[in-house]
């Protein structure tokens, strides 16, 4: 920074200075200049070998307009006062010295004498001295390049040709030091040579591309045209990476502009190497030539020697591969000090400096040094320097700073400097705000930490509370006393507990280890519930909760019997498959109750993350074990019953395949060492009884299905639904609606009507909803009737209701909520009949059990299976056009049929042609008929291998113009040879046929064993007809057919066009 105390450096000594307390301010002021004076002293220390003093020739063309005739103010208002410049007159110097002495007079006599001696040694007017006496503890910074450099220079006013040095990122401003690093060997040698030849001046110009790193200008467009005329004050050997480099400290004096670029010579390197030896021998010689710079040698006796011309820059640098430029000075435009715009902008800059100084200590020191360095006491006298200082301390964009440098109009320069300074203020304020917030947070946390530790210590001293970590360790150890941990688990627990004891509560791993120890000590190691092997008790519980379900109940009783013989019950994996609403989930609870096991249920429907089954790694934030470990923690036994619901709806995503994770869990050979990712220790879940539920087994992966024992639960027939409604659903619904002891009942006919017209599905879920709706409406009517009676009595007695305040109403409501339930009067007797269902439930949902009471030719009822249960499905076939001898045969299929059913229709069509030509050779129906086959309810997709005989019968019925009995249904797949294949879901299809009012059902003979296993109440009212070939089907459904008539049915119609016959469903 610029300083007025450049006449003598502040010396350092080993002696301790005892400054008076009241003069600490002066000591701080002196210390603030120590760094600047050290740079000056070190940079000019090597110049002490010579007493050469150069006359200072200050530019005369930059004077303010109002100072034109003032002989005392001949210096440039912008760049004439450098860091080393002294006051211009002895009178001013003396006044400054006296003032400064007066300020330091009270500190100590010794300091005052030393300062006076230093001031007395200053040189006379227009001379400036770079540094004072040598100090032993201050080493020169420029090493070996300091022996023959002149100590004092007179800065030349005109220096037309210079070494051009490109500067990156930000420009230099007159009056402010800047250290640069040169990596180019030629440039480094040229700088050294300039110092040796006592011409340490260069031109510094800003590169336009801030990412460019070069020391030589090859094109004038690389740099901005306006730069600074700078003096090399000192040089240092440096190292940039693996290459040697040179650091040079520059002091800019004034602005210059490039007029011409002289690019480096290609053959300069060889010439430079040839002159290296010569330059070494002339280190102490004073070369002279007809150069632009002249110097006066000043001997120790004070006599001046004649000026000697110094070698010109081109001749010095002609052997170096460097860039030279011809330049011209860029003077400031004349300005008026009293210009209101300049004064206003200067004042605003000072205000901004004050604001920055309030938030940035670094800026505060720089501003203080700058204010002291001013030659005039008033900053308004030097606005140009103020603008340069504002730009020099701002971290603005290089283009904005270059604009400040190029501005010659002082007002314009001040405004541009104010702009970049305002940006610096915003940056400083933001940084100050961030630092303040961070300090507040750190202070608050530190305060909380100290208070917390003090509170812990106080409580520990009072014996009121143990340390939280010690309390946790004690709790963990206490839990393990009642557990029978396996050896490998005990080892893991001890290791984790030991690590936990050495962790600090503020450590990141503290909570992770604590949670892990909490989980490992809350698992039921060695705890088992006592199982009940009483068959009668198990049968009683199962019958109490569910009607029917003989297969499930028999399997549970078998499990109890085996457990009783062995003395223990091993875990099993069962899968209950059936349509919704048949009681799969509720039967799992009954099994747990019958076996005296704890029950836990979780659903895997739509599950896509394998971590839900096997847990997360402990390295994740918020990690936790999987569902199995959570179940064991909740039930606190090793042998619960875990129900895995909706196992057929497991999803799959990029997070893994949960179905594959279940393979290890649901395998009795592997689940004795089930590994949860969070626990990371083998868990024995072989004693767990796993019960899975599904609507279909088609979507269960085969490897998973193979590990489970599948038990099918078919839909309920009407008789079963009636018993379930009377024994289970109605009592539950009455209790839920407050009618448990009321005389409100639903007749058997109403229940049957409810099943037939409102709850036609395979399960009983809709039946339960309908019954609950009936009792809710009944409860409403009873309560309303009671309230109406009470109101009528009050009116008859003349008692009117009292008005109550909101508070009393609220109290009454609370009292009513906590009062005893309302008892239904004994006189209430409601019997709900079938005719009342419309009143409670609205119009019937299912108006008819089947579409056709009398089926026309071509219409046959088939039976299908869905995950929702069995369904009845009609197959309709008609002739599209009038049958004629010119017709082309075809078959069109509709009804959203799947690929399997489309193939079945093709097989049936081909088989029907073959069968008709074999048994009725004169019937040419299929040779001329354009047919359309349809399965009603086209919005529902249909597929499956069991509609072959139904489609073939529909085609033959149309070809023979003979209807099939309306009460006959059939199911079975057909081959081209007429063989009928085995089908699945016979129970569900039988239930669907019975619900549709069928009397006869045809099924494959290979399913005869399935038919015989059906309960009698399912087969009641149905005649089962097993068939092995289609001939058996044809004989059964067309038993009364006239073969001769059917054989000759169509030829007469085809020959006679006047008697064309059109087939229609009403025929």
From Swiss-Prot:
UniProt subcellular location: Mitochondrion matrix
Domain Lon proteolytic: 854-1040
PROSITE patterns: LON_N, LON_PROTEOLYTIC, LON_SER
Residue sites binding ATP per the record: 578-585
Xref: Gene3D superfamilies: 1.10.8.60, 1.20.5.5270, 1.20.58.1480, 3.30.230.10, LON domain-like (2.30.130.40), P-loop containing nucleotide triphosphate hydrolases (3.40.50.300)
Record: transit peptide: 1-36
Presence of the UniProt keyword Hydrolase in the record: yes
Active site, UniProt feature: 946, 989
Database matches in SMART domains: AAA, LON
EC class name: hydrolase
InterPro entries: AAA+_ATPase, ATPase_AAA_core, Lon_bac/euk-typ, Lon_lid, Lon_proteolytic, Lon_Prtase, Lon_prtase_N, Lon_prtase_N_sf
Chain intervals for the UniProt region annotation (Disordered): 55-142, 262-314, 791-820
PANTHER family: LON PROTEASE, LON PROTEASE HOMOLOG, MITOCHONDRIAL
Family indicated by similarity: Belongs to the peptidase S16 family.
Name this polypeptide is given: Lon protease homolog, mitochondrial
Source species of the chain: Schizosaccharomyces pombe (strain 972 / ATCC 24843)
Organism ancestry: Eukaryota, Fungi, Dikarya, Ascomycota, Taphrinomycotina
Gene: pim1
